[in-house]
């Protein structure tokens, strides 16, 4: 048995004894025949940011071969707002490397994520998955390096409050049972996500924890490991689908919404990134942040206003991006600083062998911790279109390598203080601000669209569609208009409760 696969929780990987990246059509057919799979699901992202599903009953091996080889037709105009009904037929083709056994299906079912193709059999230019693929390709062409990412998926679980072992309001970070009520739900989600191919780092309860009208609202987080950016997006999409389905099965409600009530922590979708060459992390040089990393950060500093168009996509997003809520408001970056937009977290750069210190019986670890360093974009939230967001971040990081003054920009936007403290008001006032509404975000995207359309990454039609949707909210003054009105705020929250 391959020791690298011996602990892999994906049932197909365990059965075939090969990595999912090496799955072929023959492997899928073999697994279906040998394990009694009776149905196949095609799953694919649509314009609302959710996975859609097409079910197939396996009639015979010839039919199975046909759907795996040819895919199936779908109505693109019902999936994406930018596709006209008169020319809306698209193909969806399964990607065998994404195969997993549906953990919720009563009938044994194998599911796969799909790619979109147009009538000519070419990848659909404006599809979410293809946009991200093009962004990663352009990043590699410009830099000679590869772009990796991982997400921190925050969500609230909502259920009747038993009144027992009440947690401290807004103090739920890393809380344990019985004060944290949904640890078992989270760990079951993690197990299912891992079975579906998700590379999970860890899970924990988060800051948000409160009760309203006899209901407990508990915030949780599942954080992933850095992988190729396309895989990172796929894993986040499947994870959201799994969390919602398990909640539905158990009678809980779930929301990834950026804001669910005034004065309480909203849910973000922080994205960590690292740049890799020949399998080696390029974020550090001699134990400090490298010029490569600082160029990527400079690109994000420049394009941060328009990245909100992909990562903060409904009006409640901008009620989260306010001071003192552990969410960024200004365009800056720093080390281990949670008041900034881009944070450089601890990266195990210490010289000591902490494992040996904690465990005196252990020898020298000799572990290469340089692979761990990432940088984190903190503005996105659960309303994000995950593929567009990570594509936008790949574009921004690439853009930093196309700027002659990237290192100067990085130096100018660096901060090492809490910018929201009174004594740092001068520094705060010197920094550019993020947009404060969907309409303002649309304006920023329109001004900076050339960077995203360069190298044919984002299609003009997609950018036009995003701008049109953001402006349709008419929310330019909404934050000021209803900021102190709890009733109107709750109406807004309810409208976008199940976003993304």
Where are these regions (language model features)?
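A hydrophobic, small-residue-rich beta->alpha segment in the mid-to-C-terminal subdomain
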Residues: 373, 380-382, 393-452
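ATP/Mg2+-dependent ligation/transfer catalytic cores
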Residues: 1-210, 227-241, 252, 388-389, ...
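Generic beta-structure capping elements
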Residues: 225, 276, 345, 486-488
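Short hydrophobic/aromatic-rich motifs at helix boundaries and adjacent loops
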Residues: 1, 161-162, 212-217, 362, ...
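Histidine-centered divalent-metal-coordination microenvironment in nucleic-acid enzymes
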Residues: 113, 152-166, 209-223, 257-279
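Short acidic (Asp/Glu) and glycine-rich catalytic loops that position anionic groups and cofactors
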Residues: 7-11, 167-169, 270-281, 366-373, ...
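Active-site capping/gating regions of soluble enzymes
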Residues: 17-18, 26-48, 52-120, 124-141, ...
């Amino acid at each position: 048995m391959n020791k690298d696969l011996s602990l892999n929780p994906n049932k197909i990987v365990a059965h075939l004894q090969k990595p999912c990246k090496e799955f072929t059509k023959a492997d899928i057919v073999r697994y279906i025949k040998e394990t009694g799979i009776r149905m196949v699901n095609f799953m694919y992202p649509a314009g609302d940011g959710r996975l859609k599903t097409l079910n197939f009953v396996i009639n015979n091996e010839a039919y199975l071969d046909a759907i795996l080889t040819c895919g199936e037709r779908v109505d693109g105009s019902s999936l994406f707002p930018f596709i006209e009904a008169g020319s809306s037929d698209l193909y969806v083709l399964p990607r065998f490397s994404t195969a997993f056994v549906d953990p919720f299906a009563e009938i044994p079912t194998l599911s796969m994520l799909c790619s979109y193709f147009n009538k000519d059999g070419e990848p659909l230019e404006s599809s979410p998955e293809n946009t991200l693929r093009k962004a990663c390709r352009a990043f590699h062409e410009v830099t000679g390096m590869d772009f990796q990412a991982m997400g921190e998926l925050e969500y609230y679980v909502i259920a009747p409050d038993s009144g027992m072992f009440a947690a401290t309001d807004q103090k739920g970070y890393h809380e344990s049972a019985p004060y944290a009520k949904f640890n078992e739900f989270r760990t079951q989600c993690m197990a299912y996500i891992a079975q579906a191919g998700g590379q999970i780092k860890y899970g924990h309860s988060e800051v948000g924890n409160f009760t309203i009208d006899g209901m407990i609202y508990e915030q949780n987080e599942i954080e992933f490991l850095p992988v190729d950016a396309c895989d990172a997006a796929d894993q986040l999409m499947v994870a959201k689908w799994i969390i919602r389905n398990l909640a539905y099965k158990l009678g809980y409600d779930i929301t990834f919404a950026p804001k669910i009530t005034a004065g309480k922590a909203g849910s973000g979708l922080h994205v960590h990134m690292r740049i890799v060459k020949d399998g080696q992390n390029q974020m550090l040089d001699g134990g400090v942040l490298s010029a490569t990393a600082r160029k990527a950060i400079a690109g994000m500093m420049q394009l941060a206003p328009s990245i909100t168009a992909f990562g903060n996509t409904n009006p409640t997003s901008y009620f989260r991006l306010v001071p003192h809520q552990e969410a960024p408001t200004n365009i800056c970056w720093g080390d281990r600083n949670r008041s900034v937009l881009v944070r450089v977290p601890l990266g195990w750069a210490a010289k000591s062998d902490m494992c040996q210190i904690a465990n005196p019986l252990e020898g020298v670890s000799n572990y290469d911790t340089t692979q761990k360093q990432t940088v984190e974009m903190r503005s996105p939230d659960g309303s994000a279109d995950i593929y567009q967001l990570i594509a936008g971040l790949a574009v921004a990081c690439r853009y930093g390598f196309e700027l002659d003054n990237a290192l100067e920009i990085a130096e100018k936007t660096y901060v090492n203080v809490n910018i929201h403290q009174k004594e740092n008001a001068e520094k705060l006032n010197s920094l550019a601000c993020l947009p404060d509404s969907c309409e303002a975000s649309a304006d920023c995207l329109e001004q900076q669209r050339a960077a995203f359309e360069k190298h044919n990454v984002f299609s003009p039609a997609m950018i036009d569609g995003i701008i049109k949707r953001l402006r349709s909210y008419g929310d330019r003054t909404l934050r000021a208009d209803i900021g102190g009105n709890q009733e109107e705020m709750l109406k807004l929250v309810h409208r976008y409760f199940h976003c993304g």
